[in-house]
């Protein structure tokens, strides 16, 4: 699939994400993170619900003409979507969360080629993503060997490569 066509689809999906979806997604994620340390959870939620709405706005404001048109393997898109839909619990708010995450993550991976977390996100140990000379380095890139993780699709390199 051509990137402009895929972007057009993502842009359309971005308008399906309402303020109510953002609120439901936040409640969902708060419950899904219930057993994490409070300070980590609070920071993660703040970053997530600042970053993802900003990316949604970016998608809505961008035009196809601004993008380079290149080929994206549809199998890779399917792999990402399958991974996204298998993450987390199946509780109330899941649909809103999936709608938001599917649109934003696919845009970041395939169109914008940026990290999947905000650069301000603090990971366990207080580390965060570093940008240097146009490359991104993540402290948890190689630590996520879980088959449900989407780290393998992220543009970040492992922090140890810096």
UniProtKB/Swiss-Prot annotation:
Protein name: UPF0305 protein MmarC5_0909
Domain of life: Archaea
Protein family membership: Belongs to the UPF0305 family.
UniProt source species: Methanococcus maripaludis (strain C5 / ATCC BAA-1333)
